[in-house]
Design a protein with these regions (language model features):
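C-terminal capping/lid segments that line or modulate ligand- or cofactor-binding pockets
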Residues: 134-154, 205-306
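Aromatic-rich carbohydrate-recognition surfaces in CAZymes
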Residues: 1-26, 45, 49, 274-275, ...
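Hydrophobic core segments within long, regular secondary-structure runs in both alpha-
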Residues: 8-23, 49, 53-56, 68-83, ...
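Inter-helical turn/loop segments and adjacent helix faces that build the functional surface
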Residues: 1-9, 29-36, 55-73, 154
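Glycan-association/targeting regions that enable binding to alpha-glucans and other polysaccharides
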Residues: 293-403
Length: 403
């Protein structure tokens, strides 16, 4: 590493606290990176998983191997399920674009069962009344490129390539300076069609920031020429003073509104994280690689193809099934006894949870020998409160080739 052991210790408490928050609250996010929706977001999942792997390396360096192993186990489990949570197949868009599927922007947070990207609706902010919910499968976003940026998926992974085709079909906007992209399908954060300012509703316009992110994807895919072209597009989207705007105008000129095609809209300017992305892109192009890509995921998932031996059930992620051959890990926020059966209560087992270094109370249920079609049913006894949960939860055993 770049820091001596003594310096690492100075950061350890902060890293442990951050990792604890992620493992206790993930994989679902309460708010996506656009500060709008809760659920399973490819972007947030990528950040969470990459962060856990990096934190694990830090803990190992400080001699905390058992907590480090737990972080990697959690990262592996979440990484295994990214496609189940966020990748849809067999939609109208798939048929139209000749692809088998694509990653969606976000899927609803878990309620009574595990999220399916084809089930449920996602609330859209900044939309007029009566038009504020869309099927999750209908909302595309460039956010899925984060799976490559953070080292979890190869740029040429078929599902990533399919997603890029879907992104370009719905979100790419050709402008005088080159192509830019919208945030997501149906975005209402931007000026109205007549150029009047955003007033709680409107229409989202292209974000130069996303050209920088796409350039990093092109570089990861081995296309530095395309990345360099997008750098030029990115820079040509700046205002007269060289400041990068949040959004640019994508309609014919409206001189009376001071809006010109391809020029900054009335959005925030400068958008500081767009400038940060610009600086990172300059560095990446100089290095001929994505310089800020965390190496842990690349090594673990792309090269070694590590998979998880279990699936996790928790109250914010109540899985309804797991592949045959996997253990069932139950994670709780308080000490509990898992009262469970795999034969419709003919026989019963009681397994106590154990608290780990991050305040997670967990136990692994030995269900890896159950055959497909079996069902595990369980409830909880809470010793501290001396009460039963009084609700039964079930997890079915699927064929081993299911996610």
């Amino acid at each position: 590493g770049h820091l001596p052991r003594g310096k690492l210790d100075d950061f350890l408490a902060m890293i442990e606290s951050a990792a604890s928050y992620v493992v206790r609250n993930g994989p679902v996010t309460g708010e996506d990176r656009w500060e709008e929706d809760a659920g399973y977001s490819p972007f947030t999942l990528a950040v969470e998983i990459a962060a856990l792997l990096a934190a694990a390396d830090m803990l190992d360096a400080c001699g905390k191997n058992e907590p480090a192993n737990y972080l990697r186990e959690t990262a592996d489990c979440w990484n295994d399920q990214i496609e189940r949570w966020t990748y849809v197949t067999g939609t109208e868009l798939c048929a139209r674009e000749g692809i088998d599927g694509y990653h969606v922007r976000i899927t609803p947070p878990d309620g009574a069962g595990a999220a399916s990207p084809k089930d449920g609706f996602v609330p859209l902010k900044n939309r007029p009344p009566g038009d504020s919910h869309r099927p999750a499968e209908a909302i595309i976003s460039p956010d899925a490129l984060a799976l490559v940026r953070f080292g979890l998926r190869a740029a040429d992974d078929t599902r990533i390539v399919n997603t890029v085709k879907a992104i370009d079909a719905l979100l790419r906007c050709e402008l005088p300076q080159g192509p830019l992209w919208y945030r997501y399908t149906g975005d209402g954060y931007g000026e109205h069609e007549d150029g009047s300012p955003f007033d709680g509703t409107g229409r989202g316009r292209p974000w130069p920031l996303l050209a920088g992110e796409r350039a990093h994807y092109e570089l990861a895919a081995g296309r530095p020429g395309k990345a360099a072209e997008l750098l030029e597009t990115f820079e040509r989207s700046a205002g007269a003073g060289g400041l990068l705007p949040e959004q640019v105008w994508d309609r014919p000129d409206l001189p009376e509104r001071e809006l010109r095609l391809g020029a900054p809209s009335g959005s925030a300017m400068p958008l500081v994280w767009a400038h940060a992305e610009h600086i990172k892109l300059l560095r990446s192009l100089r290095d001929s690689k994505v310089f800020d890509m965390p190496p842990q995921g690349v090594e673990r998932y792309i090269k070694r193809k590590t998979v998880s031996p279990f699936r996790t059930w928790r109250f914010n992620n109540k899985i309804r099934s797991l592949p045959a051959g996997k253990l069932l890990r139950v994670e709780l926020a308080a000490r509990g006894v898992v009262h469970w059966s795999s034969d419709k209560w003919l026989t019963v087992r009681d397994d106590n949870t154990v608290e780990n270094a991050f305040g997670v109370h967990l136990v692994d249920l030995d269900v890896d020998g159950l055959q497909p079609g079996s069902t595990v049913v369980f409830t909880f006894f809470w010793p501290e409160a001396s009460r039963w949960e009084n609700v039964d939860f079930t997890v079915g055993i699927d064929p081993s080739d299911s996610q």
